[in-house]
Amino acid sequence: METLELQGAKLRYHQVGQGPVLIFIPGANGTGDIFLPLAEQLKDHFTVVAVDRRDYGESELTEPLPDSASNPDSDYRVKRDAQDIAELAKSLSDEPVYILGSSSGSIVAMHVLKDYPEVVKKIAFHEPPINTFLPDSTYWKDKNDDIVHQILTEGLEKGMKTFGETLNIAPIDAKMMSQPADTEEGRIEQYKRTMFWSEFEIRQYTHSDITLDDFTKYSDKITLLNGTDSRGSFPQDVNFYINKETSIPIVDIPGGHLGYIQKPEGFADVLLNMWG
């Protein structure tokens, strides 16, 4: 893996291929390796970069998180993630780059576009679970508070079951999300990663400071992506609302919420039709 030294962290990332830079931002998994099957399909067209977000996978903190980062209303980590992606983009290319964020990674991508639009050539938001600008935002914020409370008091299994039911996660995705790692060490790491995400992201990222105006300013750069196998899920409803209010196009893409793993060939074909 490649390394970029940043304030407070060593950011590590996979890089394959040639051509214009395309950065993938992972969601709850936090690690870029989930994009490697997709990267193989795109490496003849793009320099594909798949990031381990700060404090996930091989990326490591060189300074501790501030105590406030676990506050449900803290934007520290999502803003720091966005800054990391912008600095990575500038280190890799003198030109604006392509960016795709999935799930909570798409929320990071929104903050990249809002705060660092100069680094973005084109950007895609794949099934973002953000609620800030929705008419029923308070309802969803309360639901996420309840889910985190359940995880912390009743355990990860019960809390994640409620999470899946509340967001109407498709069966194809629920099965993959609940699949344990192959080794004991992997299962321990998986548990730690999910608990970290629960405490520091479920509430903070989904209710972070993004408005519809942040999209309309740069609507010519944005594509919304909804999976063909995750119809009816909350993240898809978010994209439908953005589309209704801004007319930013939605493109159907193969697979579910984890479509880049489930159907990488078809996922890549859609990206190449969009950007190739």
Swiss-Prot record:
This is Uncharacterized hydrolase MW2501. Residues 57-76 are annotated as: Disordered. Belongs to the AB hydrolase superfamily. Keywords: Hydrolase. It comes from the Bacteria. It comes from Staphylococcus aureus (strain MW2). The keyword Hydrolase applies. Its EC number is 3.-.-.-. The lineage of its organism: Bacteria, Bacillati, Bacillota, Bacilli, Bacillales. Pfam families: Abhydrolase_1. One of its GO terms (cellular component) is membrane. Residues 20-137 form the AB hydrolase-1 domain. One of its GO terms (molecular function) is hydrolase activity. The keyword ATP-binding does not apply.
